[in-house]
Amino acid sequence: MNHIKVISLVQYSSSVKKLKEEFLRNFKRFDSVEDFSDHHYVSKGKASKQHSKNWVKKVQDEWKILNQNLPETIFVRACESRMDLLRAVIIGAEGTPYHDGLFFFDIQFPDTYPSVPPNVYYHSGGLRINPNLYNCGKVCLSLLGTWHGNARQSWLPKESTMLQVLVSIQALVLNEQPYFNEPGYGLIKGTWLGESKSKVYSENVFLLSLKTMVYSMRKPPQHFEEYVQNHYFVRSHDIVKACNAYKAGAPLGSMVKGGVQDLEQARQSGSKKFKTDVASFMQTVVDEFVKLGVKELAEKPKPPVNNANTENQSKKKTRKRSRSSR
């Protein structure tokens, strides 16, 4: 009966998953909302504030660029009553320690924009998942003026855009080897020492990424509540498969849609500590998936009963009883 129950749960989950996949397909990459009461920068301005015509035009141009050019893995919401506010979510890319995760950013266009870059805050949940993303929410990026770089990497008022900022965070910050984002560490990239340290750092980052998933599911940012729920429902099995593979020794980043990405990379192995840490935290993630409705993950099917073995055991018990009665 338990085995049949699990099959029915899987079938039900499969039909629900199709509906949620449709929701995700139809979720607009760019859209506007009425308010942002939980926005990090909401207290830094007022809805009634009058901005210059040039400022309004520039922000509207930014909206247009985002609406037409956002990649499939970045979603943005603008605020109708507060044109200075945006919220963005970036999906972690395959092959990185951020794979399948959602990473949220609150953005504000200052009064002097675009003479100065936008303000960007990362929803960290108190976790430091990258040298450029502080647990206080600070985002270090040359383009934002929060990190030093050459002139071409800095904010250029007549050229730089909000789209460029978001794509830079995705490509340059949430990358395959975030360890080397730390200043000076790039000098040892490619060496045994550098790659060893990078591996340990990335393994820890993946664990923090799992914790970020839990944080987002428990406290999804406003206007992305349904998106968070549907995203993790749809990706739950891939995330669990990846965790099981990492527990078994697969190297971090080798899993793509539940399969091994690179045979040469797969010959390597995750560290013993990584396997243990993933195993110890995995159940917390699974519990959150179950709360979302992925019920079959809560069921542990028992192996089917072997009738022949059952009959033999029954005969043995009968013989024992007959002997004891003599």
UniProtKB/Swiss-Prot annotation:
Domain UBC core: 54-214
Active site: 140 (glycyl thioester intermediate)
Species whose genome carries this gene: Arabidopsis thaliana (Mouse-ear cress)
Pfam families documented for this protein: UQ_con
Region (Disordered): 297-326
Annotated GO biological process: protein ubiquitination
Record's protein name: Putative ubiquitin-conjugating enzyme E2 38
Gene name for this UniProt entry: UBC38
EC number from the UniProt entry: 2.3.2.23
